[in-house]
Curated annotation (Swiss-Prot):
The keyword rRNA processing does not apply. WD repeats lie at residues 150-194, 317-356, 360-399, 450-489, 502-541, 589-629, 742-781, 825-864. It comes from Drosophila ananassae (Fruit fly). Keywords: Repeat, WD repeat. This is WD repeat-containing protein on Y chromosome. SUPFAM superfamilies: EF-hand, Quinoprotein alcohol dehydrogenase-like, WD40 repeat-like. Pfam families: WD40 (PF00400).
Length: 1064
């Protein structure tokens, strides 16, 4: 009895958002305000309590003794959050668990967990267009990857599309052994081809002239040399007049004969060949690595990598040495990989021991790189396997093996390059393969995704004031709609094992318990789970029938109802002590799969099928009392099972009681074989077995009474119409209305507000429509006056326009219900829609992987999971401001109609009204306006059009008068067509003489005009040895071109000698 008294005190309405709240939100999270001393006192109070449990009043007294007070509504909500056992008694474990959950929700690391794998986009493969395999791959950029510390900006995970420009992303350069170079765009589109016979180096300049560029050289003997120079005017690499090639001797650089270079040497830094070098601008340190494969010589105590800072050296000792490494300067870490197949993570200031060792590769590591903003490490081994690791938790996230399929097994000498700006890994060999690694979100194309698959169900929890989304990716995600943060993500919620592999099952239905403390989900394989979604714990597992999809779930007091492709309602107990008993099966009156269902609390349940059947049930007894068909809704259909149905029912019960094999059982219960369960004579198929119209959604209006004149049930059909029924025993079909404006569209989901004033619908084409249903299907005595000016202020859709739009034309002859808003919210179908009463927010879950929030007027608030800043929202104030200009979703902006643009943006284009002399156009009546329009058209169209009608254009030449007839020779087995063609003999064209000036220019060589200038370059004492190009000599001295060339050289020499004489 005390338990019943406490339970009656906590009413269902205490979690409703209709309660009066304070102007500012009063926090219900104790972890923010409770101290350590207060927590110890509470622990003592729980220990002294009887059975170490306290009730709702006792806990409030304990908190008030510690000066922690709440108002009545807030404390009731707090108690329901703490009481996870639903026994209205709280122990110490429940209280501490609630505090821990509060800290977990505020953990920023939960925001970084990705919904999809790091490498989820198929790779882009192109032919290299080289005759041999690519041996070198480089990136030609206008800006270096390293920037000074003062210029480092915060890294964001989205882009506005400008990263594709050559200035930002650069160009790819590939080279092969035959001396061919090819230039590619950032998207691997060929630009040009060049050939070279010299050795190429890859170097970059710092754009900031204050920072000196460094050229780092590592040789076979283990020496590292650094050349530092100023990048101003390209430093020592600028072109010299008259010099085709400049050779620099290293000994002269060390002696300082070239002032542009500042050399520095590290002799015998390693005992083996240098494999990789890197200079960190932020840490002012040099990193150099080498491989030590001779284990007998070095015995594993070799400095695989050495970091040099000024004159200090730090040795990172790694067995077999280091083949490649990556320095993440923002995290002060370095990741190494070598022939020992291990990936090591080091702190640059602790070289004695690695922070973590990542194992899993079966071959030597050839490439490692880090994404600091994503906290991910990528490693590639010799066997072309890519592994992705979490940088903080040091766990394996993904193993990517598509390179083994794309590249031949004999091709092992590959070249890798990671583009940090585009986040692409390019693999070059005989093919060019581009792999996107955690690509940034293009906010110019999309606002991001909520799930990794279509969103199936969206719900609003009034107790915790958060949004729960379920998707076909088997994810359950809890969102805070007021900040846009993701609180909890639960992956692989429904699974099954097939041939030893665990497969995720799509979530198709979900709902909350009456007090909204737990979540019930149904999956495509017929499984049901009850979740304590605050800690991602499964409380209970259930199932309706194997391999039969659950399409709808209902949770009322002490009972759970589930229905789906098994064509009947299954009832589970929700009473303590009887929850694990056998479920109760309601009578099987449906002849096809159940697609949707809804409940009217305390009165009844309505279910609808794929064939258009509708059955009303008593909620208390589970007995049907009315049956309809949407094709003929006014016809009375008797609720009676035929002899064949009864016989089939008895047979199915006998088969269910026998132990059967899994394969045969799954075959019998599959949807493909559903016709075997409903075999009936042809004359008995009257209830919609062959009806093409299916029911997509049903909705009970909770505030309307069960009378004959109140339309309380809305039935959505796939034809685009919504039928209205009365769920009274002597009620039935009342009327229907068209709910779409496009052919082929239909309403897939519906919901209403708390007082059933507005009907919110989501269609298969992605449209959101709002209907005003206060005076729709109610007695005349209950109809109220509609204040249209007030509705026009809230819904811009109702304001008049110059032309009647398509959404309004579709319902111009439909007086009720009143369409108050219509706009395109998604590119794909809307699978679920819900409404938050107090802030007036509509949120929709779509097949395009997103869940979007809208104001009731149609303004776009945001997409859950977006990378953009979130709008300021509160659960106690109405969302939206008429003075604010709202943005549009990028994907909708490209396809939006004028109505969608007006509704989402909240702006209406000014009507251009033509004024005439002495009167205003708006005041004209309809007849006068029609007469003037006809007069204007006559004035434009009655006058003859002036020639030429098409204007001046090119005229085709006329056809020849003579008709050329060709007689074909058909005497042979085939017709020699070419023998009948008239072929004219070619004539030699007269070649015009080449002017003497052009001939002279063709014979010249630009190198003949450049000779060393005395006074600027000292050939004898300088370290720069300028090689003059050898002049070509020809044996044909009588050639006039050679005579002209020799004469030109003589003239140039005389001019130079005279100029020197004048200078002296």
């Amino acid at each position: 009895m005390p338990m019943l008294i406490q339970k009656s005190e906590v009413e269902y309405q205490t979690i409703s958002s209709t309660q009066s709240h304070l102007a500012e939100e009063q926090s219900e999270r104790l972890h923010r305000c409770i101290s350590k001393e207060q927590l110890e006192k509470l622990h003592e109070a729980f220990l002294n309590a009887p059975e170490r449990q306290v009730g709702i009043d006792d806990l409030r007294v304990m908190l008030e003794d510690l000066d922690i007070t709440f108002n009545d509504s807030m404390y009731t909500r707090l108690f329901l959050k703490i009481n996870q056992n639903r026994d209205f008694r709280v122990d110490w474990n429940e209280f501490v668990s609630y505090l821990i959950f509060g800290f977990q929700e505020e953990d920023p690391s939960s925001q970084k967990e990705s919904l999809i794998l790091p490498i989820s986009v198929p790779p882009m493969v192109r032919k290299s267009e080289h005759r041999s395999a690519i041996c070198c791959l480089a990136l030609l950029k206008a800006k270096s990857d390293q920037v000074p510390i003062e210029e480092v900006t915060e890294t964001v995970n989205f882009s506005f599309g400008g990263e594709d420009s050559p200035e930002a992303s650069g160009m790819w350069v590939t080279a092969s052994h035959e001396g061919m170079m090819r230039f590619w765009t950032s998207h691997m589109e060929p630009i040009r081809t060049a050939s070279s016979e010299s050795i190429h180096l890859n170097y970059a300049f710092y754009n900031n002239g204050k920072v000196h560029s460094k050229l780092i050289l590592g040789d076979y003997a283990g020496n590292v040399r650094i050349l530092s120079y100023s990048p101003h005017l390209r430093g020592p690499f600028q072109a010299k007049p008259g010099a085709a090639l400049i050779e620099v001797v290293w000994s002269d650089v060390l002696k300082g004969k070239i002032p542009q270079f500042v050399p520095k040497e590290y002799i015998s830094l390693h005992n083996e060949m240098i494999s990789c070098v890197y200079f960190s601008l932020h840490m002012n340190a040099l990193f150099a690595s080498a491989e030590y494969r001779n284990t007998k010589k070095y015995r594993g105590r070799c400095p695989g990598m050495i970091m040099v800072t000024y004159d200090e050296r730090s040795n990172f000792r790694i067995p077999l040495g280091v083949s490649t490494f990556f320095v993440a300067e923002s995290h002060n870490i370095v990741v190494t990989g070598g022939p020992d197949t291990f990936v090591r993570i080091w702190d640059v200031y602790i070289p004695t021991e690695p922070s973590a060792i990542l194992t899993g590769h079966n071959g030597g590591i050839v490439l490692v790189f880090v994404q600091p903003e994503e906290n991910k490490v990528y490693s590639v081994d010799y066997q072309k396997i890519i592994k992705v690791w979490d940088l903080q938790e040091h766990t394996l996230l993904q193993t990517y093996g598509d390179l083994v399929r794309l590249i031949h097994h004999s091709e092992t000498d590959l070249t890798y390059y990671y583009h940090s700006h585009l986040r692409e890994l390019v693999v070059a060999g005989r093919k060019l393969i581009s792999i996107k690694c955690c690509p940034r979100v293009r906010v110019d194309l999309t606002d991001g995704n909520t799930h990794a698959a279509p969103v199936s169900v969206v719900l609003y929890n009034r107790l915790f004031r958060n949004i729960v989304t379920c998707g076909l990716d088997s994810y359950i995600i809890v969102w805070d709609p007021w900040t846009g943060r993701r609180k909890i993500i639960m992956k692989s919620c429904h699974t099954k094992m097939i041939y030893g592999e665990i497969i995720d099952i799509e979530i198709t239905a979900a709902c909350f318990d009456p007090l909204e403390q737990f979540l019930l989900t149904g999956a495509r394989d017929g499984s049901l789970k009850i979740w304590n979604y605050n800690n991602a714990v499964v409380v209970r597992n259930m199932s309706i029938m194997p391999d039969q999809e659950v399409t709808s779930v209902i949770w009322v007091v002490d009972r759970i109802l589930a229905m789906g492709w098994d064509r009947q309602v299954t009832e589970f107990n929700d009473v303590v002590g009887r929850e694990y008993g056998d479920p109760k099966k309601w009578p099987k009156f449906h002849t096809d799969d159940i697609t949707c269902a809804d409940v009217k609390l305390g009165e009844g349940v309505v279910t609808a099928t794929y064939s258009g059947e509708i059955i009303f049930w008593k909620l208390e007894t589970g007995q049907p009392y009315r049956r309809y068909s949407v094709m003929d809704p006014t016809r009375f259909i008797e609720l009676k099972l035929t002899a064949e149905e009864e016989k089939s029912l008895r047979r199915s019960k006998r088969l269910a009681s026998r132990p059967t094999h899994t394969g045969i059982h799954g075959l019998q219960m599959s949807r493909a074989g559903r016709s075997t369960v409903t075999n009936r004579p042809e004359d008995n198929r009257d209830y919609g077995a062959n009806i093409p119209i299916s029911v997509q959604a049903v909705l009970f209006l909770q505030t309307r009474p069960q009378t004959l004149k109140h339309g309380s049930v809305f039935i959505s059909l796939d034809t685009g119409y919504i039928q209205v029924y009365s769920h009274h025993q002597r009620g039935g079909y009342m009327m229907e209305f068209l709910a779409v404006h496009k052919t082929g569209d239909c309403v897939l989901t519906m919901c209403t507000d708390r007082k059933n004033r507005f009907l919110y619908t989501g269609t298969a084409f992605g449209y959101v429509k709002i209907w005003y249903i206060v005076n729709f299907c109610v007695p005349a005595s209950e109809k109220t006056h509609v204040c249209m000016p007030k509705l026009r202020l809230e819904f811009i859709f109702l304001r008049k326009e110059l032309f009647l739009t398509r959404a309004k034309r579709a319902i111009r002859n439909q007086p009720e219900p009143l369409l108050v808003s219509s706009y395109k919210g998604h590119l794909k179908a809307i699978n679920s829609i819900a409404f938050i009463n107090l802030p007036k927010i509509v949120f929709t879950g779509s097949h395009d992987y997103s869940c979007r929030l809208w104001t009731q007027g149609g303004r776009y608030l945001g997409t859950l999971g977006t990378v953009l800043p979130w709008s300021k929202l509160t659960p106690f104030e109405r969302a939206g401001d008429d003075s604010q200009t709202y943005r549009m979703p990028p994907d909708i902006k490209k396809v939006a109609s004028s109505t969608t643009l007006k509704v989402i943006s909240g702006l209406q284009a000014e009507r251009m009204v033509k004024r005439q002399e002495g009167k205003v156009t708006e005041d004209r009546d309809e007849d006068t306006a029609q007469t003037e329009d006809v007069t204007e058209l006559k004035r434009l169209l009655d006058s003859p059009i002036k020639e030429p009608i098409l204007g001046k254009h090119f005229e085709l030449p006329g056809r020849t008068v003579l008709d050329q007839h060709i007689e074909l020779d058909t005497s042979q087995s085939y017709i020699a067509v070419y023998t009948h063609l008239k072929v004219h003999s070619t004539e030699m064209l007269e070649r015009l003489p080449t002017p003497a000036v052009i001939g002279k220019v063709q014979a010249e060589n630009y190198l003949h005009h450049y000779v060393p200038v005395e006074g600027k370059v000292d050939i004898s004492g300088s370290s720069l040895n300028i090689k003059q190009p050898t002049r070509r000599r020809s044996g044909k001295t009588h050639d006039p071109r050679n005579i002209r060339t020799a004469k030109a050289r003589l003239d140039i020499g005389m001019g130079l000698s005279s100029s020197h004489a004048s200078q002296q």
